[in-house]
Amino acid sequence: MLMDVFSSFDAHSYNLIWLSMPLWLLSSMVPMTVLFSDVHSKSGSTSSFRSLVLSFTYSMIRLNGKGLKLSGFPLVMSGLFMMILMLNLSGNFPFFFPVSGQFVFGFSFALSIWTCLVLSSLLCSFEQGLMSLVPTGCPLILVPFMVVVELISGMLRPLTLVLRLTLNLGAGKVILTMCSSELVVGWLNSSSLITGVGGIKGLLMGGGVFGAAEVAIACIQCYIFCVLLCLYTEDHSS
């Protein structure tokens, strides 16, 4: 089958897709193991790593919204951050299917967390939840129109969030794939003066740069996804 730069996002182009399943399972189980194991211990690498992850996510939540006031939200975001980060990083390995770059994956988390935040806000204070649909100082005649606009914009939040994650991961992987392919082709077509050990070193250095860029994109997009979910708590009722 003819392969192109978008074939890495097509599950049917992976004849060995079953190799990705252990890594998916590991990416799902590691956050639970790190966050809930060795709870009563105050020493050890697992406890230190858990403290580091929790402190980072707690600071992220504290600076972006009112998530610390919601019971269980920091723990959910800590596990989600670790899982998406590991899946983003695992998608950079050869022959591993990038499941985090799929629309359904991100949409399931974005929709479920956004729905829980909306329901929690309405249950906490139904009046404040409805008042958030009307901007401050809005003329009375425009209230029905603004309510419809706010409802539509609110319901589009999960869609825009997952599109941002999927498109950015996809665009980054496509660009890096094209650049790395051009690098390999250029090295293979180069003259004998720059081949040999020097050419191999240049190829390895170029591959290292592109690999570091892929890791940076995976980390940044995971952080942006979780930060935007935290910002949705700004509209939560007090």
UniProtKB/Swiss-Prot annotation:
Gene3D superfamilies, alphabetized: ATP synthase, F0 complex, subunit A
Listed InterPro entries: ATP_synth_F0_asu (IPR000568), ATP_synth_F0_asu_bact/mt (IPR045083), F0_ATP_A_sf (IPR035908)
Bilayer disposition of the protein: Multi-pass membrane protein
Coiled-coil annotated residue ranges, if any: none
Primary site of residence: mitochondrion
Cellular compartment(s): Mitochondrion inner membrane
Molecular-function annotations in GO: proton-transporting ATP synthase activity, rotational mechanism
Gene Ontology CC annotations of this record: mitochondrial inner membrane; proton-transporting ATP synthase complex
Keywords, alphabetical: ATP synthesis, CF(0), Hydrogen ion transport, Ion transport, Membrane, Mitochondrion, Mitochondrion inner membrane, Transmembrane, Transmembrane helix, Transport
Keyword Kinase in record: no
Segments passing through the bilayer: 16-36, 79-99, 103-123, 129-149, 209-229
Database matches in SUPFAM superfamilies: F1F0 ATP synthase subunit A
CDD domains: ATP-synt_Fo_a_6 (cd00310)
Family: Belongs to the ATPase A chain family.
Description of how the protein assembles with itself and partners: F-type ATPases have 2 components, CF(1) - the catalytic core - and CF(0) - the membrane proton channel. CF(1) has five subunits: alpha(3), beta(3), gamma(1), delta(1), epsilon(1). CF(0) has three main subunits: a, b and c.
Its job: Mitochondrial membrane ATP synthase (F(1)F(0) ATP synthase or Complex V) produces ATP from ADP in the presence of a proton gradient across the membrane which is generated by electron transport complexes of the respiratory chain. F-type ATPases consist of two structural domains, F(1) - containing the extramembraneous catalytic core and F(0) - containing the membrane proton channel, linked together by a central stalk and a peripheral stalk. During catalysis, ATP synthesis in the catalytic domain of F(1) is coupled via a rotary mechanism of the central stalk subunits to proton translocation.
Record's protein name: ATP synthase subunit a
Organism: Mytilus edulis (Blue mussel)
Lineage: Eukaryota, Metazoa, Spiralia, Lophotrochozoa, Mollusca
Gene name of the encoded protein: ATP6
